[in-house]
Design a protein with these regions (language model features):
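PLP-dependent class I/II
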Residues: 4, 18-299
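Long amphipathic alpha-helix in the N-terminal Rossmann-like dinucleotide-binding domain
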Residues: 5-11
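Glycine-rich loop-to-alpha-helix module at the N-terminal edge of alpha/beta enzyme cores
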Residues: 1, 12-15, 19
Length: 299
């Protein structure tokens, strides 16, 4: 059926995961091409979560995790990401929660909006946490190539495929926004459950775009170095200059396509700063509160 994606694309995705992440995937059973990874958020939720079930969502985090689960009737349970913990989950805090109704935990590393990078230690902790509590970790991993020379995958943890799903997106890794080509990788059973949902929603991606995407997965190391490191480094320098002009503090080790900064104490709140910039310079800067309450002093 067309929804599963053409064999050439699935093989290219599997080869790409092996080449860059050192993860072995069966292209026939452990990969599902997506019309952009964003639709995967819908498919995974419909496949694994029933109305009234709970889902763990990061604060701050990508707003779609919250809005879509609310639409589908899931109960949102926020878990904190804080600067003093390097924007990583506080597992001691998580262990104190009642997790009996939690079905999935959304994670996103490298992180949007904070720019926190992934580590294998973090991924190992997440996999162990998932196993202890019978929770599925859904790691949204589109930014691992942006300003990052060592991309990581949660699926590199032994046994992770049993309890983890990972998204990837060519919009970010290959600078192909608008093509709407993404993927998820996990165990064969999860793929089948997700495919049952997806096959009732769409009919797959235009074949020539799949063939072109398969070719793009062969891009060289040099291509990625220029497009995803060098070009973004020049843009990052400009963004850092803006942060300095505004008096914001930020971590220069951030990766991904965003720059996250803490506003000066001289402002009452982030809205005061963003409104000032909007009206005086006619530039919109995203206020951090849209990502959650832990972002209320950030842009």
């Amino acid at each position: 059926q067309p929804t599963v994606g053409i064999p050439e694309l699935r093989k290219a995705m599997a080869d790409w995961y092996k080449r860059w992440y050192h993860v072995e995937l069966d292209p026939a059973t452990e990969i599902q091409p997506l019309i952009g990874s964003k639709e995967g958020i819908l498919h995974v939720t419909l496949a694994l979560v029933n109305p009234g079930d709970q889902v763990l969502v990061p604060n701050p985090g990508y707003p779609t995790y919250t809005s879509l689960n609310k639409i589908l009737g899931s109960e949102i349970v926020n878990y904190n990401l804080r600067e003093d913990n390097h924007w990583q989950p506080d597992f001691d805090e998580l262990e104190k929660m009642d997790l009996s109704r939690v079905k999935i935990m959304w994670t996103n590393y490298p992180n949007m909006p904070t720019g926190a990078n992934a580590t294998m230690e973090l991924y190992e902790k997440l996999v162990n946490f998932a196993r202890r509590h019978n929770i599925v970790i859904v790691n949204d991993n589109p930014y691992s190539f942006i300003l990052n020379k060592k991309p990581l995958s949660i699926l590199n943890v032994p046994g992770a495929k049993e309890c983890c799903i990972e998204f990837n997106s060519m919009s970010k890794s290959h600078n192909m926004p608008g093509w709407r080509v993404g993927m998820l990788a996990t165990n064969a059973q999860f793929v089948q459950w997700i495919l049952k949902i997806k096959s009732n929603i769409d009919s797959g991606t235009f074949r020539p775009m799949q063939l072109a995407a398969a070719q793009a997965y062969n891009n060289s190391v040099e291509w990625h170095e220029e497009a995803n490191v060098n070009v973004y480094s020049r843009r990052r320098q400009l963004a850092e200059e803006i942060m300095k002009v505004l008096g914001c503090s930020f971590d220069r080790n951030q990766v991904g396509m965003f720059l996250w900064g803490r506003i000066p104490e001289s402002y009452n709140d982030v809205e005061e700063l963003t409104e000032k910039v909007l009206h005086e310079a006619r530039v919109f800067i995203t206020p951090g509160f849209i990502f959650g309450s832990n972002g209320k002093r950030y842009i």
